[in-house]
Amino acid sequence: MKYNDLRDFIALLEARGLLKRIKQEIDPHLEMTEICDRTLRAGGPALLFENPRGYTIPVLGNLFGTPERVALGMGQESVSALRDVGKLLAFLKEPEPPKGFKDAWEKLPIFKQVLNMAPKVVGKAPSQEVVLEGDAVNLDQLPIQTCWPGDAGPLVTWPLVVTRGPHKERQNLGIYRMQKIGKNRLIMRWLSHRGGALDFREFQLQHPGKPFPVAVALGADPATILGAVTPVPDTLSEYAFAGLLRGDKTEVVQCIGNDLQVPASAEFILEGFIAPGDMAPEGPFGDHTGYYNEVDKFPVFTVERITHRRDPIYHSTYTGRPPDEPAILGVALNEVFVPILQKQFPEIVDFYLPPEGCSYRMAVVTMKKQYPGHAKRVMMGVWSFLRQFMYTKFVIVTDDDVNARDWKDVIWAMTTRMDPARDTVMVDNTPIDYLDFASPVSGLGSKIGFDATNKWPGETQREWGTPIAMEQAVKDRVDAIWESLGIDLPTAY
């Protein structure tokens, strides 16, 4: 399944009945959020608002509102197939030396595929069909959503921010929300450890007092967007990874005003800079936690130039109490994470990030336990192996007889296999999500691990319980006579 740009993907979804065009006039101020939220919670389609009130540019919402659509965006026909994406990333993250000539020959196609997916630079691009500069730059013409009643203003929610540090050849792609505060000014809310913020900091050290070039793509193709939120190895660019997902090289074009390369097929490109010391208070905004975040200062992105396709489409979303679109993305990307973790920790059977836990704040791990204390090693591994889990506050580790995705199973294991004093691990003064107001200090808090595995000799002095299970022969006999008993059971049984 191939698509070249966002419009191809929209056509694919529409052909499958997975996109609904809304012709009625809908206000980007609050109304779109309510419609998208109801649709997402019901597992409904992507929405194309063709007549946003006060604007001439259509708005695409709820694009990744189901795990199945995320899988399609990553070039896969099913959510389960995302495990294959994870296996590829696991291999690229830590490739094993070939065990012999035959093994090297078998791995050669993978390396060739990766090497052949470097982005293709083009001289002419749809994203630069229309060029607006000077006084013509006016962000007020974009139907930017105001998502919640207490929001400080309109918020750009799907920006693909392109930066490059002074000592780096490859660019960084990141998604950082941006508050509109003027016709050509947006607050860039990137946290200090994110790639864009690190590039900015290094640039300031290398070129003190000089403006930092930035480009922002709006409405890039799904593979490129999803590549920016996937744990891509540092040796692989997000553009190359997007090409692997898409099955075709990512086409990029150089910006008109700087040397950054942006997706050639994007609907909009914003070119500009961040001036040293230009900061503004950002927020409050309703966030993926289900609360409004506190106000804090972040750099201001000054837009010098807007380029866009003819008849452009504005891609947007909202964040709120799960489930929201980031939570759905988390459910799908969960399948990508599993093989990556299993590469480092083969004892892991399953790994689950419950969407109710804001996609990353809680993790449940099932494992094949091999020695006393093994669960604690896995806890530490989850917190340290991938930077995506540095903010995970709660890690629950159970044996592989427990279904990590069934709370009834997990709670049973926790209440029957845990002693709170012996089987919890508390780690203080660790990195915590800036948005987590429950932590005593902004960005710094504690983590806790729960060992809900069966305890081995050395971990307990008591005789351990044996789980109850019916004999299989009895179950088979009852299966054979069940229909004749005439007992009607609910389908959920």
Curated annotation (Swiss-Prot):
Pathway(s) per entry: Cofactor biosynthesis; ubiquinone biosynthesis
Residue numbers annotated as active site: D287
Location of the protein in the cell: Cell membrane
Recorded superkingdom: Bacteria
Bilayer topology annotation: Peripheral membrane protein
Residues noted as binding Mn(2+) in the record, renumbered to the chain: N172, E238
Cofactor: prenylated FMN; Mn(2+)
Biological-process GO terms, alphabetical: ubiquinone biosynthetic process
UniProt keyword annotations, A-Z: Cell membrane, Decarboxylase, Flavoprotein, FMN, Lyase, Manganese, Membrane, Metal-binding, Ubiquinone biosynthesis
Keyword Cell membrane: yes
Note on cofactor: Binds 1 prenylated FMN per subunit.
A cellular component term, taken from the record's GO annotations: cytosol
EC annotation from Swiss-Prot or TrEMBL: 4.1.1.98
GO molecular function terms attached to this record: 3-octaprenyl-4-hydroxybenzoate carboxy-lyase activity; metal ion binding
Catalytic activity: a 4-hydroxy-3-(all-trans-polyprenyl)benzoate + H(+) = a 2-(all-trans-polyprenyl)phenol + CO2
Binding locations of prenylated FMN: I175, Y176, R177, R189, W190, L191, R194, G195
Cross-referenced NCBIfam families: PRK10922.1, UbiD family decarboxylase
Purpose: Catalyzes the decarboxylation of 3-octaprenyl-4-hydroxy benzoate to 2-octaprenylphenol, an intermediate step in ubiquinone biosynthesis.
Family according to the record: Belongs to the UbiD family.
Name of the protein in its database record: 3-octaprenyl-4-hydroxybenzoate carboxy-lyase
Organism: Cellvibrio japonicus (strain Ueda107) (Pseudomonas fluorescens subsp. cellulosa)
Encoding gene per record: ubiD
